[in-house]
Amino acid sequence: MERTCLAIILAAGESTRMKSAMSKVLHPVAGRPMIAHVVDALASASITDVALVVGRDAEAVSTAASTGSVTVSSFLQKERLGTAHAVLAARAAIEKGYDDVLVVFGDTPLITAAPLTAARERLAEGNDVVVIGFETADPTGYGRLIVKDGELLAIREHKDASEEERRITYCNGGLMAISGSKALDLLGRIGNANVKGEYYLTDLVEIVRSLGGRAIAVEAPEEELTGCNTRAELAYIERLWQQRRRQELMLAGVSMVAPETVFLAWDTELAEDVLVEPNVVFGPGVRVESGAVIHAFSHVEGAHVRAGATVGPFARLRPGADLGPKSKVGNFCEVKKAEIGAGAKVNHLTYIGDAFVGAGSNIGAGTITCNYDGVNKHVTRIGENTFIGSNASLVAPVSIGSGALVASGSVITEDVPADAVAFGRARQEIKPGRAPILRQRYEAEKAARKKVKAAE
């Protein structure tokens, strides 16, 4: 579509019902501010110019909306005098001249490009106002779209609707497309002769008809127009988003044993033939390649899991974790800012942070890379085909050469050459018959403590 378009995002509400210290549009859906989802939908609809109408938390909202995919200009609505008043806060942007003006809300993160494009296409056919509506089983509380012979006659609020009109299930979704050449004239005709003294965008329908123009409605799925005013609605939107994304991934070849227990971030990338077991959480910045397996109860964030690698169960991958092909990070392991080479194994109860583990190496249970000295982080380098025995502490900065072997229980503070064997522990001593003597001493000490406590 070659027509020019300005999208106006209304995001100036007080968010009172959210009971929050920040604007509702900043609350995350799938790990990202909900307003960023709206901007992405606009970008997907090939809309590049956005006027953002802000109120509280103006700077933070503007930052969240500036995703880089569109050009965003912010406009402050100083008073809250209705939706039409909010749109006119962006008058300077409208005056630049566009074929289409599209009005959307910052709290509808489930909206997709399809209804936005459909609305613009109907403007291109010569209509002056296009309202995006939805069909619902329970229209109570919604404004009804009064349509006759394909033309939208009015938007009737529930409280003002007749009994016959209340039986209508086609409802106003709030989003609207307006002919750019007529937008300012139409908006300027909206009055505030109502109980609240506010300027309502919905009045445009009857205004344009009174001037001989034409208004119509296009339908979108109800869930796409779901707005967010409360924490309960935020949770509902999150659930809908997760359901939609899981379905998309499974249709693309990802297997999920119990999809309802898998939680994805907005940018999670799962390739074909990835298997995800129950109760897995993906944070932002995750890419999982084909054939990888994410076992149950794992948490993955900011990580790259390469082809054929396995994670978990009960594993945590933190930002910067990079697992090589067919590598393994097993149960109760944590990996942070570390590269695990191809075929390397970190099987049990291990922390690998700020480290490089070479291909084919085996890291024993309980191994820790001691990367933090209280002030700075330091790097541990482990070569290829190296064996680290159980319960080893590798005190960074330290390097262990390829093919080396580190004995169980060692504390390694110096570099280990390739193919060397390193012991970093005290030699075991055995004292025959000493155990009964120690037990007697311990019992006596225990009795003495009890006696002192009783005397207090």
From Swiss-Prot:
GO cellular component: cytoplasm; membrane
EC number, as in UniProt: 2.7.7.23, 2.3.1.157
Matching SUPFAM superfamilies: Nucleotide-diphospho-sugar transferases, Trimeric LpxA-like enzymes
Highest taxon of the lineage: Bacteria
Catalytic EC class: transferase
Main location: cytoplasm
Record flagged with keyword Transferase: yes
Pathway(s) served: Nucleotide-sugar biosynthesis; UDP-N-acetyl-alpha-D-glucosamine biosynthesis; N-acetyl-alpha-D-glucosamine 1-phosphate from alpha-D-glucosamine 6-phosphate (route II): step 2/2; Nucleotide-sugar biosynthesis; UDP-N-acetyl-alpha-D-glucosamine biosynthesis; UDP-N-acetyl-alpha-D-glucosamine from N-acetyl-alpha-D-glucosamine 1-phosphate: step 1/1; Bacterial outer membrane biogenesis; LPS lipid A biosynthesis
Keywords: Acyltransferase, Cell shape, Cell wall biogenesis/degradation, Cytoplasm, Magnesium, Metal-binding, Multifunctional enzyme, Nucleotidyltransferase, Peptidoglycan synthesis, Repeat, Transferase
Family stated for the protein in its record: In the N-terminal section; belongs to the N-acetylglucosamine-1-phosphate uridyltransferase family.
Binding partners and assembly: Homotrimer.
Protein name: Bifunctional protein GlmU
Source organism of the structure: Sinorhizobium fredii (strain NBRC 101917 / NGR234)
